[in-house]
Amino acid sequence: YLFTIKSKRYCIVEKKIYSYDEAYEESLRYFQGDELAARVWVNKYAVKDSFGNIYEKSPEDMHWRIANEVARIEAKYPNALSSEELFGLFNHFKYIVPQGSPMTGIGNNYQVASLSNCFVIGVDGEADSYGAIFKVDEEQVQLMKRRGGVGHDLSHIRPKGSPVKNSALTSTGLVPFMERYSNSTREVAQDGRRGALMLSVSIKHPDSEAFIDAKMTEGKVTGANVSVKLTDAFMQAAIDGKPFVQQYPIDADEPLFKKEISATDLWKKIVHNAWKSAEPGVLFWDTILRESVPDCYADLGYRTVSTNPCGEIPLCPYDSCRLLAINLYSYVVNPFKPDAYFDFDLFKKHVALAQRIMDDIIDLELEKIERIMAKIDSDPENEDVKLSLIHISEPTRLQLIS
C-alpha cells in the first residue's frame, strides 16, 4: 500500500512468509521462465531469516524494499527522489542495478550484512609476525561471514629462507600463507556461496615467482584470486632484457635480502601461467598509484595496497567499496534495427542519479554501523575472571595426616 509524506509517495510491502516453491514460481514468472535466474535470486537475494523463512516472493518485492529505504534517505536532502521514481530505475534490473550486498542488505533487518561489497585490509608496522598474519586471517573471515569480499597484500611477509627467531630458524615464505588465507575463504559459506578473496604481491618481492606459480598445481590456492603488482622498472627491464633486483623489505633503503633475476624470463612465465590457468592477474602498480586519489594524501597515512577480489578497485587498508551497475542495453533505442542509437541524454541523467543513490547507500551503511555500536554499548558482555587453585589436594592430605 502507499502513503505520502511531504508530497512524496512511498510503498510499503506487508511482511508475509512464503514457501520456497512460492518464491521460486513467482520469480520464474518474473524472469520469464529463466530457471537459473529464479533459483539464484531466491537462494541469494530474497530476504530470509536464520530459520529459512522467506519474506519476498520475487525481485519486485526486493526492488520496492530498496526503493523505500533509499527514498527514506533521499527525504533528508533537497529534491528528494520518491520510492516510485527509484523503483522505476530498479525494476526488472532495467537501468540501475545495485550489486549483491546492497541488494541483500538494504532494508534487511533479519541478517547482519554489510552494504559494502568489498574490503581491503592490512597491518601497520611489523606485519610479518604470526600474530599479524593471524590478525589478517581473523579480519578476513569476519568480513566474509558478513558477505564482504576481501583483498590484501602479502608483500610484507618475509621470503623463504629468511632467518626467524623461533625453533624453525628460517621462514617458509609466503606461499604457505596463501594456502592459509585460501582455506579460510573456502570455509566461510552462506547458502553455498563462499567468500571472495584477492591476494596480491609486489614483483619486487623475492618470493613473487613462487607466488606466480602457486596455482599451477591443481587443487592449490583454490579459494583466492591472485594478482602480481608490476612496477614500471620491472616492465622496462623485461622490454630491455635487463636484470631486475628483488629485495625484502620491498621498499627498504637498506634491504635485509636481495636477489637478481631475469625480468624477461619472469614476464614470460606470468604470460604463460595466465594463458594456462587464467592467473595471475597483473596490476600495473605504478600507474595505479599515479592515478590514485588517496595516495595524494600519503603524508596523512593514506596508501593504496591491494584491490577488491575482482581487481577493478584499488583500495587503502580498511577501505571499502559499494558496487552498482548500469545496464547499457536499456539505453539502446530500436536495438538491432538500422535506426538504432544510444540515448546519451538519458544515460547522462541516470549516471548522475546512480552516483546519488550510491551516496544514499553510504548513509544507510552508517546507520547499520550506528546500530551495531549502540547494541555493543547497551549490552556489554561481562568479562570472565578465572581464579585457579594449585595443590588443591594438599590441604585435605595434610589434614588427614594430622
Question: Which residues are covered by each model-predicted region?
Answer:
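Extended catalytic cores of very large enzyme megasubunits
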Residues: 1-389, 393, 397, 402
